[in-house]
Amino acid sequence: TDLLNDDQPYLVQTRSGKPMVSVSYTSEVNDFSFLRQGLVAEGGLQMFQEQFDWLYEESASSGRFMNIGLHPHVIGQPYRIRALRDFIRYAKSHDDIWWTTREEIAEWYLENHESHIPI
């Protein structure tokens, strides 16, 4: 969904009665922050790493997900892409990270958290 409120998936009830999994989006940890905040690569990298570090620490007790909103015309600029490259290297240096899609997160949640789903 386009909800911006969590770093864990959860169910949203719909009018049809069939639940929908919310895998929240973030507008804060987003390459547009480079534009809004006037960040250079180092500032963007710091933002990505600080978000990751906090969520990684919290994930020791319960899973978390992190997404970064990326737009080719923003992050793809030569003076910005380094932040993404360096962040990916940084995150890959940590154990137990699942590189996946939002769709796969939703599917996993539905398959593994049946007790949360009202029938």
Regions found by a protein language model. Give the residues of each.
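Active-site-adjacent pocket scaffolds in enzyme catalytic domains
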Residues: 1-62, 113-118
